[in-house]
């Protein structure tokens, strides 16, 4: 993982016969040490004290000053890190600035490079989690999944997650605002269960109905999606059957925990 992240950030490829061996050597030394962290790779490079090693060290160090860079760079002594042994891991990264799908790698800004690197780390952890004990059903929930699906690397990683999930008894949940966010056919074809909540936008309604594989121009189908009440959704099961289901929260605490309404609106309703 360290090799993938640092070569991605620095743009050093295996074809670079001068820089690549120096970087890999430093990473290998850190991986064999007691404290394994990307900051220590910078230290190891500076110990070499050669023009190439110092250049690479300075390049890597230039990424460490950004707000969420500490999630990638540490000295190897961090505690309370994410672990596959935990029953629940929640990873919140609110400041990711992911590039548009059409943006070329050469056009990435520094913050976009870091954001994609963070996405790669999160997805790799999710893949490791999926590939753990096959006898246990596991869930990977990607909230605001449009952010992942709107960047080329995220779309590729999402496909890997879904394919691995089917083989390793894991469910991958894509939670997003629009069915149009799931644009790639290969990903669509690997999604088993589909849930769609009320929409009043006719274009979004037609897009959702098409995603479900039912007649998007049928007025009854459109009305059914438009007239859904709170707590109801359109569901397509594993066999392709489509119907309206009502969701009843078993515990009131869960209802409050996942209530995303602003406090003012919540108080008015109460």
Sequence positions of predicted segments:
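P-loop NTPase motor core of the ASCE superfamily
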Residues: 1-36, 182-270
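Conserved P-loop NTPase motor cores
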Residues: 101-222, 248-251, 257
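P-loop NTPase motor domains
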Residues: 1-163, 225-229, 233-238
């Amino acid at each position: 993982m360290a090799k993938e992240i640092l070569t991605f950030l620095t743009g050093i490829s295996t074809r670079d016969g001068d820089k690549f061996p120096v970087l890999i050597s430093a990473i290998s030394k850190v991986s064999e040490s007691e404290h394994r962290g990307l900051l220590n790779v910078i230290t190891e490079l500076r110990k070499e004290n050669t023009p190439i090693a110092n250049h690479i060290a300075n390049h890597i160090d230039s990424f460490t000053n950004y707000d969420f860079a500490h999630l990638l760079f540490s000295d190897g002594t961090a505690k309370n890190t994410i672990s596959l042994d935990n029953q629940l891991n929640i990873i919140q990264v609110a400041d990711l600035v992911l590039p548009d799908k059409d943006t070329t790698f050469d056009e990435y800004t520094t913050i976009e490079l870091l954001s994609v690197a963070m996405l790669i780390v999160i997805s790799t952890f999710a893949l490791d989690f999926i590939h753990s004990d096959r006898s246990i059903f596991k869930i990977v929930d990607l909230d605001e999944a449009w952010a992942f699906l709107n960047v080329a690397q995220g779309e590729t990683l999402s496909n890997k997650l879904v394919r691995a999930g089917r083989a390793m008894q894991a469910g991958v949940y894509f939670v997003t605002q629009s069915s149009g966010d799931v644009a790639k056919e290969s990903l669509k074809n690997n999604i088993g269960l589909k849930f769609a909540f009320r929409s009043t936008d006719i274009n979004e309604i037609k897009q959702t109905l098409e995603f479900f594989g039912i007649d998007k121009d049928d007025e009854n189908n459109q009305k059914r999606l438009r007239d859904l009440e709170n707590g109801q959704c359109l569901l397509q099961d594993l066999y392709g059957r489509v119907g309206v289901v009502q969701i009843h929260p078993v515990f009131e605490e869960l209802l409050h925990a996942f209530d995303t309404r602003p406090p003012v609106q919540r108080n008015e309703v109460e």
